[in-house]
Amino acid sequence: FGGNSLSCAVGEYILETVLNDSFQSELKEKSLYLMENLVKIKTKYPNIIKDIRGRGMMIGVEVGSYANSIKALGIEKKVLLNVTSETVVRLLPYLTISIEEIDEFITKFEEIIESL
């Protein structure tokens, strides 16, 4: 943190938060919730979503040749998506995301997939 006392204080607070058992428990619940909802979309659109893989909140969605189209449609819906290869859309939400924000994302993501 470069010796800056403010940076050190912020870093300490973040570490305390992230290492807190309740934070980790909530994060695990949210990541399972996100994954379960993505699997529901995959079940509805197996011709588009080939695979979903990840760990925690780092998720890759295998979508074949649709990756760049999904990214472009995401921008229109104010959803930032990253294409990590020609066939994978990477989801990497911030760790403090709420269930309501996950629901909003899932709604928009399904609309994107449905429009293809």
How should each PLM-predicted stretch be described?
Residues F1-L116:
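Conserved N-terminal phosphate-binding loop of PLP-dependent enzymes in the Aspartate aminotransferase
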